[in-house]
């Protein structure tokens, strides 16, 4: 990722974490990494672990974010959720889900749209 895209992605993850926290989510980790990859945000909400994929785009409809997750990315996110459970010695029946937070930034930085899509990624 280029420097500009990295900065935009980092900014988006910060905005997403704040957005979720304001809605009662407890943010447990950001940029959690293992050999399988990275989870943008790990949170807890209403007893569930919530793994959050953040999609930050410039000048695009935020609704396109969930559709932008390929089957390969879906499989990777599912594997990452399993890896997180294993790394933290959590039982396999721990309730969890994968959400998407889509952030769209307009041509002017003041034009920001945030959309939270619970259960956006499910097994195919």
Swiss-Prot record:
InterPro entries: Restrct_endonuc-II-like, tRNA_endonuc-like_dom_sf, UPF0102_YraN-like. It comes from Roseiflexus castenholzii (strain DSM 13941 / HLO8). It comes from the Bacteria. Belongs to the UPF0102 family. One of its GO terms (molecular function) is nucleic acid binding. It holds the Pfam family UPF0102. This is UPF0102 protein Rcas_2007. Transmembrane segments: none annotated.
